Protein backbone atom coordinates (compact mmCIF):
# COMPACT_ATOMS: atom_id res chain seq x y z
CA UNK A 1 0.00 0.00 0.00
CA UNK A 2 3.03 2.27 -0.34
CA UNK A 3 1.60 4.12 -3.32
CA UNK A 4 -1.66 4.67 -1.43
CA UNK A 5 0.33 6.17 1.46
CA UNK A 6 2.18 8.44 -0.97
CA UNK A 7 -1.13 9.65 -2.42
CA UNK A 8 -2.55 10.37 1.03
CA UNK A 9 0.57 12.35 1.99
CA UNK A 10 0.48 14.31 -1.27
CA UNK A 11 -3.20 15.16 -0.79
CA UNK A 12 -2.67 16.15 2.85
CA UNK A 13 0.34 18.30 2.00
CA UNK A 14 -1.51 20.07 -0.79
CA UNK A 15 -4.45 20.84 1.48
CA UNK A 16 -2.23 21.96 4.34
CA UNK A 17 -0.69 24.53 2.00
CA UNK A 18 -4.06 26.24 1.49
CA UNK A 19 -4.32 27.11 5.17
CA UNK A 20 -7.31 29.44 5.11
CA UNK A 21 -9.39 26.85 3.24
CA UNK A 22 -8.32 24.11 5.65
CA UNK A 23 -9.17 26.23 8.69
CA UNK A 24 -12.59 27.18 7.31
CA UNK A 25 -13.51 23.60 6.43
CA UNK A 26 -12.43 22.28 9.81
CA UNK A 27 -14.38 25.11 11.44
CA UNK A 28 -17.54 23.91 9.71
CA UNK A 29 -16.85 20.28 10.62
CA UNK A 30 -16.18 21.12 14.27
CA UNK A 31 -19.32 23.27 14.48
CA UNK A 32 -21.45 20.53 12.91
CA UNK A 33 -20.08 17.87 15.27
CA UNK A 34 -20.63 20.13 18.29
CA UNK A 35 -24.21 20.86 17.21
CA UNK A 36 -25.04 17.18 16.79
CA UNK A 37 -24.09 16.39 20.38
CA UNK A 38 -22.71 18.14 23.43
CA UNK A 39 -20.23 20.95 22.57
CA UNK A 40 -17.72 19.24 24.87
CA UNK A 41 -15.15 16.86 23.35
CA UNK A 42 -14.97 14.85 26.57
CA UNK A 43 -18.61 13.80 26.20
CA UNK A 44 -18.85 13.98 22.39
CA UNK A 45 -16.55 11.43 20.75
CA UNK A 46 -17.28 12.67 17.23
CA UNK A 47 -16.26 16.20 18.21
CA UNK A 48 -13.14 14.92 19.96
CA UNK A 49 -12.08 13.03 16.83
CA UNK A 50 -12.57 16.08 14.58
CA UNK A 51 -10.56 18.26 16.97
CA UNK A 52 -7.72 15.72 16.99
CA UNK A 53 -7.68 15.74 13.18
CA UNK A 54 -7.75 19.54 13.14
CA UNK A 55 -4.72 19.65 15.42
CA UNK A 56 -2.89 17.23 13.12
CA UNK A 57 -3.57 19.70 10.29
CA UNK A 58 -2.17 22.47 12.52
CA UNK A 59 -5.46 24.32 12.79
CA UNK A 60 -4.96 27.05 15.43
CA UNK A 61 -6.68 26.73 18.79
CA UNK A 62 -8.62 29.97 18.28
CA UNK A 63 -10.25 28.54 15.13
CA UNK A 64 -11.29 25.40 17.01
CA UNK A 65 -12.57 27.39 20.00
CA UNK A 66 -14.52 29.80 17.78
CA UNK A 67 -16.39 26.92 16.10
CA UNK A 68 -17.25 25.33 19.46
CA UNK A 69 -18.33 28.68 20.92
CA UNK A 70 -20.60 29.24 17.92
CA UNK A 71 -22.30 25.90 18.61
CA UNK A 72 -22.58 26.72 22.32
CA UNK A 73 -24.13 30.06 21.45
CA UNK A 74 -26.99 28.40 19.66
CA UNK A 75 -25.97 28.89 16.05
CA UNK A 76 -28.95 27.97 13.90
CA UNK A 77 -27.15 26.60 10.83
CA UNK A 78 -27.76 22.92 10.11
CA UNK A 79 -25.20 21.04 8.04
CA UNK A 80 -25.88 17.92 5.99
CA UNK A 81 -23.32 15.42 4.74
CA UNK A 82 -23.32 14.37 1.11
CA UNK A 83 -21.32 12.34 -1.39
CA UNK A 84 -21.00 12.95 -5.12
CA UNK A 85 -19.33 10.53 -7.52
CA UNK A 86 -18.19 10.79 -11.08
CA UNK A 87 -15.70 10.15 -13.82
CA UNK A 88 -12.79 11.94 -15.41
CA UNK A 89 -10.90 11.00 -18.58
CA UNK A 90 -9.73 7.48 -19.43
CA UNK A 91 -10.99 5.43 -16.48
CA UNK A 92 -10.36 8.01 -13.77
CA UNK A 93 -12.84 8.18 -10.91
CA UNK A 94 -13.49 10.77 -8.24
CA UNK A 95 -15.55 11.05 -5.06
CA UNK A 96 -16.34 14.34 -3.32
CA UNK A 97 -17.63 14.32 0.25
CA UNK A 98 -19.50 17.45 1.30
CA UNK A 99 -20.80 19.16 4.41
CA UNK A 100 -23.26 21.90 3.59
CA UNK A 101 -25.98 24.14 4.97
CA UNK A 102 -27.52 24.47 1.50
CA UNK A 103 -27.86 21.19 -0.38
CA UNK A 104 -29.34 22.77 -3.51
CA UNK A 105 -26.38 25.13 -3.80
CA UNK A 106 -23.92 22.28 -3.35
CA UNK A 107 -25.56 20.05 -5.94
CA UNK A 108 -25.58 22.89 -8.47
CA UNK A 109 -21.94 23.74 -7.80
CA UNK A 110 -20.75 20.13 -8.05
CA UNK A 111 -22.62 19.59 -11.32
CA UNK A 112 -21.14 22.78 -12.75
CA UNK A 113 -17.62 21.74 -11.78
CA UNK A 114 -17.97 18.33 -13.44
CA UNK A 115 -19.45 19.88 -16.58
CA UNK A 116 -16.83 22.62 -16.90
CA UNK A 117 -13.79 20.54 -15.96
CA UNK A 118 -14.15 17.61 -18.34
CA UNK A 119 -15.87 15.19 -16.00
CA UNK A 120 -19.18 13.37 -15.84
CA UNK A 121 -21.15 13.21 -12.61
CA UNK A 122 -22.61 9.79 -11.85
CA UNK A 123 -25.43 8.40 -9.76
CA UNK A 124 -24.96 7.45 -6.12
CA UNK A 125 -22.73 4.37 -5.99
CA UNK A 126 -21.42 4.85 -9.52
CA UNK A 127 -17.78 4.61 -8.44
CA UNK A 128 -17.74 4.17 -4.66
CA UNK A 129 -17.97 0.39 -5.04
CA UNK A 130 -14.44 0.58 -6.47
CA UNK A 131 -13.13 2.18 -3.25
CA UNK A 132 -12.69 0.74 0.24
CA UNK A 133 -13.62 2.85 3.26
CA UNK A 134 -10.46 2.48 5.33
CA UNK A 135 -9.07 3.71 8.62
CA UNK A 136 -5.59 5.19 8.27
CA UNK A 137 -3.30 5.81 11.26
CA UNK A 138 0.20 7.27 10.86
CA UNK A 139 2.90 8.02 13.43
CA UNK A 140 6.68 8.04 13.68
CA UNK A 141 8.18 4.55 13.99
CA UNK A 142 10.12 1.79 12.28
CA UNK A 143 8.83 -1.53 13.70
CA UNK A 144 5.60 -2.51 11.91
CA UNK A 145 5.74 -6.10 13.21
CA UNK A 146 5.60 -4.92 16.83
CA UNK A 147 2.71 -2.58 16.05
CA UNK A 148 0.86 -5.36 14.26
CA UNK A 149 1.16 -7.53 17.39
CA UNK A 150 -0.28 -4.72 19.55
CA UNK A 151 -3.26 -4.37 17.25
CA UNK A 152 -3.72 -8.13 16.94
CA UNK A 153 -3.76 -8.51 20.73
CA UNK A 154 -6.44 -5.80 20.89
CA UNK A 155 -8.49 -7.65 18.24
CA UNK A 156 -8.33 -4.74 15.80
CA UNK A 157 -9.29 -5.73 12.25
CA UNK A 158 -6.10 -4.68 10.42
CA UNK A 159 -5.69 -4.69 6.65
CA UNK A 160 -2.00 -3.80 6.60
CA UNK A 161 0.83 -2.30 8.65
CA UNK A 162 3.84 -0.87 6.83
CA UNK A 163 6.85 1.34 7.42
CA UNK A 164 7.10 4.27 5.01
CA UNK A 165 9.82 6.90 5.25
CA UNK A 166 10.22 6.55 9.01
CA UNK A 167 6.49 6.36 9.63
CA UNK A 168 4.31 3.46 10.70
CA UNK A 169 1.26 3.39 8.43
CA UNK A 170 -1.73 1.32 9.56
CA UNK A 171 -4.76 0.47 7.45
CA UNK A 172 -7.77 -0.83 9.38
CA UNK A 173 -11.36 -1.68 8.65
CA UNK A 174 -13.25 1.61 8.87
CA UNK A 175 -15.27 0.40 11.84
CA UNK A 176 -12.08 -0.36 13.80
CA UNK A 177 -10.27 2.97 13.36
CA UNK A 178 -11.11 4.26 16.84
CA UNK A 179 -10.43 0.84 18.37
CA UNK A 180 -7.00 0.88 16.74
CA UNK A 181 -6.23 4.37 18.03
CA UNK A 182 -7.28 3.33 21.55
CA UNK A 183 -5.06 0.22 21.42
CA UNK A 184 -2.05 2.29 20.38
CA UNK A 185 -2.68 4.88 23.09
CA UNK A 186 -2.92 2.07 25.66
CA UNK A 187 0.51 0.89 24.44
CA UNK A 188 1.98 4.34 25.06
CA UNK A 189 1.72 5.81 21.56
CA UNK A 190 0.03 9.20 21.71
CA UNK A 191 1.42 11.35 18.88
CA UNK A 192 -0.24 10.75 15.51
CA UNK A 193 0.28 12.65 12.27
CA UNK A 194 -2.83 11.13 10.66
CA UNK A 195 -5.98 9.50 12.00
CA UNK A 196 -8.46 9.55 9.14
CA UNK A 197 -11.16 7.63 7.36
CA UNK A 198 -10.12 7.45 3.70
CA UNK A 199 -11.78 6.05 0.60
CA UNK A 200 -8.90 4.12 -0.98
CA UNK A 201 -9.17 2.94 -4.57
CA UNK A 202 -9.01 -0.82 -5.06
CA UNK A 203 -7.03 -0.27 -8.25
CA UNK A 204 -5.45 2.78 -9.83
CA UNK A 205 -4.93 4.18 -13.31
CA UNK A 206 -2.14 6.29 -14.78
CA UNK A 207 -3.16 9.12 -17.06
CA UNK A 208 -1.35 10.66 -20.00
CA UNK A 209 -0.04 14.21 -19.46
CA UNK A 210 -3.00 15.63 -21.39
CA UNK A 211 -5.61 13.63 -19.45
CA UNK A 212 -3.81 14.31 -16.18
CA UNK A 213 -4.05 18.05 -16.74
CA UNK A 214 -7.82 17.76 -17.24
CA UNK A 215 -8.28 15.52 -14.21
CA UNK A 216 -6.12 17.69 -11.98
CA UNK A 217 -8.28 20.67 -12.91
CA UNK A 218 -11.38 18.71 -11.92
CA UNK A 219 -9.93 17.65 -8.57
CA UNK A 220 -8.60 21.14 -7.79
CA UNK A 221 -11.97 22.72 -8.56
CA UNK A 222 -13.77 20.25 -6.30
CA UNK A 223 -11.29 20.79 -3.46
CA UNK A 224 -11.65 24.56 -3.81
CA UNK A 225 -15.42 24.43 -3.32
CA UNK A 226 -16.30 25.60 0.19
CA UNK A 227 -18.79 22.77 0.74
CA UNK A 228 -16.38 19.97 -0.22
CA UNK A 229 -14.55 18.42 2.74
CA UNK A 230 -12.64 15.60 1.04
CA UNK A 231 -11.89 14.42 -2.48
CA UNK A 232 -10.79 10.87 -3.33
CA UNK A 233 -9.65 9.50 -6.67
CA UNK A 234 -7.97 6.52 -8.34
CA UNK A 235 -5.24 8.27 -10.34
CA UNK A 236 -1.79 7.01 -9.39
CA UNK A 237 0.23 9.82 -10.98
CA UNK A 238 -1.61 12.72 -9.34
UniProtKB/Swiss-Prot annotation:
Name of the featured protein: Probable transcriptional regulatory protein YeeN
Is the keyword DNA-binding in the record? yes
Q: Does the keyword Acetylation apply?
A: no
Question: Where mainly found?
Answer: cytoplasm
* UniProt record similarity statement: Belongs to the TACO1 family. YeeN subfamily.
GO MF terms, alphabetically ordered:
DNA binding
Top-level taxon in the UniProt lineage: Bacteria
* A Gene Ontology cellular-component term: cytosol
Gene Ontology biological process terms, A to Z = regulation of DNA-templated transcription
SUPFAM superfamilies linked = YebC-like (SSF75625)
> Where in the cell is the protein located?
Cytoplasm
InterPro entries per the record? Integrase-like_N (IPR017856), TACO1_YebC-like_2nd/3rd_dom (IPR048300), TACO1_YebC_N (IPR049083), Transcrip_reg_TACO1-like (IPR002876), Transcrip_reg_TACO1-like_dom3 (IPR026564), Transcrip_reg_TACO1_YeeN (IPR026562), YebC-like (IPR029072)
Keywords attached to this entry: Cytoplasm, DNA-binding, Transcription, Transcription regulation
Amino acid sequence: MGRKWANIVAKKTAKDGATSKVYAKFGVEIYAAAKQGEPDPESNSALKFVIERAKQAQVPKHVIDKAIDKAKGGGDETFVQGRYEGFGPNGSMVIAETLTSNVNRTIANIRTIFNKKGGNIGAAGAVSYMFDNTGVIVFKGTDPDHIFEILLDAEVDVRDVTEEEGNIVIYTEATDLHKGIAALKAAGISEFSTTELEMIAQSEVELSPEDLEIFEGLVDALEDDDDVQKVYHNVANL
